[in-house]
Amino acid sequence: MEKLETGRQPQNTQQAGSRISIIGMVQTAIFGAIIIIMAFTPFLGYIPLGFTRATILHVPVIIASLLMGPKKGGVLGFLFGLTSFINNTMNPTATSFVFTPFYSVGEVSGGIGSLIICFVPRILVGILPFYVYKLAMYFRSKRGKSGVSNAGLILAGVTGSLVNTLLVMNLIFVFFREGYAAANDVAVSAVYTFILSIIGINGVPEAIVAGVLTLCIGRVLMKKNIRERLGFRNDLGY
């Protein structure tokens, strides 16, 4: 009897691992569907502002990072970047060449820099918020407190949003300053000032919205009993 029980244990462990893996894939697919629906619904995921687009697509990526961890968050961040790539290729604005190599304005065209701008910041949106929240929880536990950290949720949301905005805009300056200046009818010498104005006009409100939404949604979904009921495993250690 003892041998039989011992033989069953690895099989049970394997079945449990497979079940967790399937649940993880389903959860990732659900968040992926949310991102795709938002991305391709007019004025929802991407909001046209003439020369550029504002976005709140980073919010589900941030929430996914907190609930499922940085690996799945990074995958969903890549999906965020892919929707941006498709949107800017199929429905371009004057500056879409910074997000896709398949669009040009006059003599200005995209290239490898476009792919870096389109994907790298968005992947990081799915990774960094997890560690920001984990750090907030570490300091919270040091003070003898438990439960969801409101400050951590806000910081995670703001960080994810600012990582996207600051990296995208600064990489535009690195790779496409002349083309970006020409597309916006701005002198090359003044293009970074123009970029800073976009960060202020678009980036700051986006960060505030991301912080508020991450707090409101996270306060519900990050509670231990809710996470366990929904099957989320994020390795935050609480």
Go through the PLM ranges and name each one.
Residues 1-238:
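Loop-helix junctions at membrane interfaces
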